[in-house]
From Swiss-Prot:
Annotated protein name in UniProt: GPI ethanolamine phosphate transferase 1
Glycosylation sites: 138, 196, 201, 285, 311
Organism field: Kluyveromyces lactis (strain ATCC 8585 / CBS 2359 / DSM 70799 / NBRC 1267 / NRRL Y-1140 / WM37) (Yeast)
Domain of life: Eukaryota
Cytoplasmic side stretches: 1-8, 478-487, 532-558, 620, 675-686, 740-773, 837-845, 904-919
Cell compartment(s), UniProt: Endoplasmic reticulum membrane
Lumenal side: 30-456, 509-510, 580-598, 642-653, 708-718, 795-815, 867-882
InterPro entries xrefs: Alkaline_phosphatase_core_sf, GPI_EtnP_transferase_1, GPI_EtnP_transferase_1_C, PIGN_N, Sulfatase_N
Assigned keywords, A-Z: Cell wall biogenesis/degradation, Endoplasmic reticulum, Glycoprotein, GPI-anchor biosynthesis, Membrane, Transferase, Transmembrane, Transmembrane helix
Membrane topology: Multi-pass membrane protein
Biological process according to GO: cell wall organization; GPI anchor biosynthetic process
The protein's enzyme class: transferase
Amino acid sequence: MWSRHRLYFIVAGVLFHLFYLWSIFDIYFVSPLVHGMKQHQSTDEAPAKRLFLIVGDGLRADTTFDKILHPVTGEHDYLAPYIRDLVRNEATYGVSHTRMPTESRPGHVAMIAGFYEDVSAVTKGWQENPVDFDSFFNQSKHTYSFGSPDILPMFKDGATPNKVDAWMYGHEFEDFTQSSIELDAFVFRHIYELFNNTKSNKTLETEIKQDGNVFFLHLLGCDTAGHSYRPYSAEYYDNVKYIDKEVKLLVEKVHEFFDDEDTAFIFTADHGMSAFGSHGDGHPNNTRTPLVAWGAGINKPVKNQAPIFDNYTENWNLADIKRNDVNQADIASLMSYLIGANYPVNSVGELPLNFIDAPEDKKLNALFNNAKAILEQYLVKEQEIIASQFVYKEYEAFVEIPYQEYLQQIESLIERIAKGENELEPDAIKLTEELMKVTLDGLAYLTTYNWRFIRTIVTLGFLGWIVYSFSIFLRLFILNRDYNSHKSLLNYFIFGSLTIILNYVLYYQKAPFNYYMYLFFPLIFWSEIFTDRVVLDDGVKEFLKGISIPKRIILVSAIILVYESIVYAFFDRWIFSLIFNMLSFYPLICGYRDWKRNTLWFITGAAISVFTLLDAVKIESLTQINIASGLIVLTALSGFLHLRKQLNSYTTTVFICQILLVILMVLATNKSIVSLQNRTGLPRDAQVAGWVILVVSLLLMPLIHYMKPNNNYKVRMLIIFLTFAPTFIILTISFESFFYLVFSAYIVQWIEIESKLKEQTPNTSHYKQLIRVTIIGFFLLQNAFFGTGNVASISSFSLDSVYRLMPIFDPFPMGALLVIKLIIPYIILSAGLGILNLKLHIKDYTISTLIISTSDILSLNFFYLLKTEGSWLDIGITISNYCLAILSSLFMLILEIVAHVVLKNVQLSKPVIASKKTN
């Protein structure tokens, strides 16, 4: 049973890491969402009567404009000739730059509401979470939307009642193994049906033909094809060609139906697609999307005075046409202007004047209204901050030049322009754009106003956890006497006063609930540290007993060096390979001279070092899967033969069943992969077999074993290894199963080497070996993830393996399967650490507890390495670094419980062999 202190440690650790995992989103990536602003109309005279927004989900800018070699037909041609023809003759075009996360919800919110949701928005789901702020659709007369059930409902349900109509297909349509074109065909088919229905419904015709309407076509086909077959596949290219053909037909039908030229068209995408069929991170292939606008109110293409070439667009053959890039949120302002609607009150988009066909004074007025709408947000946000601060420091830029002065100068210029001083128009536009930029910077200033205060709290929380958890480690595993700690009156006074004062500050600042939790943990931790300072002092002395001061300095320096090296390894995985090769000499350095075992350790270390040199983003390889699976089976059989004297008939039967499950899973995986690669869909029998084997191997087989468990630690490790092998195989894309095999072998060899070193070392009063084991264990904890991936690929997992079980899109179950695959190496490591506790004759969980108490050194590093500026790829990597560091600690806490179960009653001595006869 766990002691009271250990139970508190586990519960506090889990809660602490869960809340602090979220802290970066509350501190660094908070959207400046405010309510209560008044509306600002974009323009008095709408250039267009209606607008069509066509969004190709997952469509890359380069694919839209490049000349492409089709992988099947061999044709070398443009995929979207009609769109290109518009760019050359009718439209204004550019690249729309999205922000991270490059997912569908944030992308659509940016272009339709003009608002960048915070990074955590990707966790909000889809139709279950309608947007809780104003949008362009909400400002339209009426919006008719067609497409995916993942996107349409969040704008329909979040808008004014009866403002948005939606025609959606069912989720069963989103089958990654079927033709993605059918998803887009549904959209075009239903909008044409809507037009046809007006022939027998005059009320509908009147409604559809009223000014200010919006038609939203969400085309999911490219995203589906990209996920299934990659953006360089025939399926993806054919989907782009289909969209181009249908857009041409749509334009013809729209002109025919409305019988005028007063329609504006916007063609764009919510995000791009990586070369490996994923999106979510800040890679340029994910953040660069096409933007083509034509029709009423839109400029014709502008010729460059001299062709402009760059590496990205060199194959577009559009160097003579001016390219006008925008930020994704700018699209909302453009669309609002085109139909004369109010700017969405939360929009931070800037009206892209290069797209507009209008006199300069009209452009200026529309831009000025845009600036006033953004300024309105700043003023409302500022009042919120003033009301929640004891002392308010005004935004520096508006101290130098007050916003009232900006408004007066711009209004004065507009009046002079109206009187005929047209030469002032460029100055007025420049000043208006400056006001918008300063205001947006001011919004960022207000959003981060309390950064220093809350970051100090979080820092004290991390430091408090590190010291508190280390004191728990000392109390439970180092000190051999009880301490009756009681809080003194001084403790109650100091921390009671701090609790009241700081909580009142948060209350006065109208802080969210999470902020109170960020404060709660450091107060609790430091109160306990202050109370148990004698435990900490005595424990450190005992822990380092027998180690001289110079050696202590060297030891601490070495620990810091290793941990900081791992910080750098998060950015460059090859550092893991370097450390593995250095560890190959670890037994020799420690005086272990078994050359056979040392040679095997050296070979295994060299093998495992290879994985962090391989590309973290993988391409499906059935050959690698089969070879690795064969090696897993051979390793299991070898282990079975080696341990056969330790097995009774019951355990032997369990082993045979587990090996058979591995073989059956290989067969099911092969059938699934071959069928999916041949574009014939997922065979039902292979899908059912995959699920059955996965459930049986993960749940049923462990239960069967624990009915009559074999308590030999080697047998138990082999049982655990085989338990997860089928799951790892079906979720493997290429070399991951190799890693699973080598990683498991490395841990087993490490256990044996450490136990031999323990036998060679006389009993001493210090804990050198424990420190060494903890450092290596912490290193392996990080490698459990980096062996098969990196932080830049966390949001870019290929879904190839998941299709073998779930061909129809369902993000949360798919994500759950990927998480299971991720945590399996952690479970293997946790079991290995548990066995090491036994082999080294130390208390259960000693090693893992010391790892947990030091691992947040990484978390604190990455908390301050977070970036909020620069490329979205860099920002995304820093977010992922922090999350992975926190989750590593959290995994160790949770997996302690798992290890407690899987290693129940494990013994180092040989078990009594039962009769070979069955009952």
